[in-house]
Curated annotation (Swiss-Prot):
Homodimer. It comes from the Bacteria. NCBIfam families: PRK05313.1 (NF003700). Signal peptide: none annotated. Belongs to the UPF0210 family. InterPro entries: UPF0210. This is UPF0210 protein NMA1908. PANTHER family: UPF0210 PROTEIN MJ1665, UPF0210 PROTEIN SPR0218.
């Protein structure tokens, strides 16, 4: 890859003034060779493999960050879904496996580890159910373990039994963790991807290599600055500016990923183009949409502006890398985006509007705080709605929702760090309990029949 001097100067400016960073280098690790019928042996095998494969990740990231002057904010691990790996133990709880993941991740110094997961889009095995029922206690007794459940897909439909259980699991997690913080580490997916480097939804797919490096970049501030400094007038010109900026961002991520792959002797997997915001001023997706001409994110026109942004990011990134994957779009996590927080506090950005926005971007209803007395069936209904958007539109959608015990609409909750803070948003008063409790499966749509 040839790098021009002009690109280097632009990169320096992106880092110094516009909050550009490589958000994560994530190593995906296959755990199938760790399987044992004895859960203690399984845990030891898992610990040994993670600490062996991932031992140099943090040092490598620090070296590359210093070498290129680009912040690499997080180093993470994703593993094969534990419901698959622990099935042979026939244990009645997988909390000890989550604790092993936590211990191994801390031993090598990474920020998070994902893969305490179950893929149940068409049905739940006994192991899947054990894992899902273990999630609340696992989130309570670990610090950096992330969990995910894939409850639907375009090819399989939506598993409503799993949706109901997911709602109950999130509700229970909220009740036993401080201010529901455990729920910030749980994502419920439709059409989950196997190579996602971002938390909390990362897991290492069964079709992946023994180990692989996936990189996530982040540059909302860079895109906003590019629009501010451009003379674009029409939306066609705006899209062109975003596309060219995404190209530059992606080139940096590609360079870091290839270098990390070489140093760690692990194959380079994908580069995720997603614009991932932070609570810092100047690092907001919402402010990009406002720069396009919206007075506040969430007003009429927001979904169209977001569709333009998401598409232009993809087009620019695809030109810059032949290894684009993961989620690759624009994230809209309420608590992690300064502009989203302001729009929600103003009452303009609502849960309904966020749901509409998820139809055109990555990935879904993300980091949304709701009242602590929100019933489990309402959470399940929100998950089902979001999954339906993903299923029908053949895209990944997800829900990361936090019922905050003791809080109600008008309150706010502080999560800290990259997770930021969020105003508690209202949910509908009507009930979907009878609908959710019907169970069964919402059949796959006609567009699933592509062969």
């Amino acid at each position: 890859m040839s790098i021009q001097s002009g690109e280097i100067l632009e990169t320096v400016k992106m880092v110094a003034d516009q909050n550009f960073d490589v958000r994560t280098i994530t190593i995906g690790i296959d755990l199938h060779d760790c399987i044992s019928t004895d859960i203690d042996v399984l845990n030891q095998n898992i610990y040994n493999k993670i600490t062996t494969v991932g031992k140099d990740l943090v040092a490598t990231a620090k070296y590359l960050s210093a070498k290129y002057g680009v912040p690499i904010v997080n180093q993470r691990i994703s593993v094969t879904p534990i419901a698959q790996i622990a099935a042979a133990t026939h244990a009645d709880s997988y909390v000890s496996v989550a604790q092993t993941l936590d211990k191994a991740a801390k031993a090598i110094g990474v920020s998070f580890i994902g893969g305490f997961s179950a893929l149940v889009q068409k049905g739940m095995s006994p192991s899947d159910e054990v894992l899902i029922r273990s999630i609340p206690e696992a989130m309570k007794t670990t610090d950096i373990v992330c969990s995910s459940i894939n409850i639907g897909s375009t090819r399989a439909g939506i598993n409503m039994d799993a949706v109901r259980l997911a709602g109950e699991t999130i509700k229970r997690t909220a009740e036993i963790t401080l201010e529901g913080f455990g729920c910030a580490k749980i994502v419920v997916f439709c059409n989950a991807v196997e190579d996602n480097p971002f938390m909390a939804g990362a897991f290492h797919g069964s079709g992946e290599a023994d180990a692989v490096i996936n990189v996530g970049v982040s540059g909302p501030g860079v895109v906003k600055a590019a629009l501010e400094n451009s003379d674009a007038t029409t939306l066609t010109e705006v899209a062109e500016v975003v596309k060219k900026t995404a190209f530059k961002i992606t080139r940096v991520g590609e360079l870091i990923g290839r270098e990390a792959s070489k140093m760690l002797n692990i194959p380079f997997g994908i580069l995720d183009l997603s614009l991932a915001p932070t609570p810092a001023v100047g690092d907001s997706v919402a402010r990009i949409l406002e720069e396009m001409g919206l007075s506040v994110c969430g007003t009429h026109g927001t979904t169209a502006a977001l569709a333009l942004l998401n598409d232009a990011v993809k087009k620019g990134g695809m030109m810059a890398s032949s290894a684009v994957g993961g989620l690759s779009g624009a994230f809209i996590p309420v608590s992690e985006d300064e502009g989203m927080i302001a729009a929600a506090e103003a009452g303009v950005l609502t849960l309904d509007k966020l749901e509409a926005m998820t139809a055109v971007c990555s990935v879904g209803l993300d980091m949304i705080a709701v009242p602590g007395d929100t019933p489990a069936h309402t959470i399940s209904g929100i998950i089902a709605d979001e999954a339906a958007i993903g299923m029908i539109n053949s895209k990944t959608t997800a829900v990361r929702i936090i019922p905050v015990t003791g809080k109600t609409v008008g309150d706010s909750v502080e999560f800290g760090g990259l997770l930021g803070y969020a105003p508690v948003m209202p949910v509908k008063e009507g009930s979907c309990e009878v609908f959710v409790n019907r169970g069964g499966r919402i059949p796959a749509p006609v567009q699933s029949m592509k062969n």
